[in-house]
Amino acid sequence: MKNLSLLAVLLISNFCFSEYLEKLVIKKVVDGDTVHLYHDDTIYKVRLIEIDAPERNQPFGKDSTDYLKRLLNEGKVDVEISGTDRYGRKLGRLYWKGRDINREMVIAGYAWVYDDYVTDKSFYENQSKARELRKGLWKDSNSIPPWEWRKRKKQ
């Protein structure tokens, strides 16, 4: 029984772990939800959590990437890393001058709330408002979420 309790504590503590890094240099904006950051001689490939931006070859993909570049034009961000995805990218939330960049992408209509992975349900309010105001990708009433786009491309 003690072993099971210890295992549960270890699993929970590992799941809840997050690392906060400050003033990382932006090396590259890959697309609307992925960036490469530099800090202490390390390159971090970071996938923005809570959101899924259009793929580069998808309608609004370039717009989404360009918008993220504009948001990050000052060159340094803080990041809260909460894990690693199956591609080895760090999963994180970016902050620039106190602004939650992940949320800003949804507010501006350049990313969807990533239904399968969202933990902060308030992102849905931001998405509904962007849709209502027809911002960004919501200008097209038939826009396709990236997860559906990827699925269709595999077929």
Please state what every model-predicted region is.
Residues 2-5, 14-155:
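Small beta-barrel nucleic-acid-binding modules, primarily SNase/OB-fold domains
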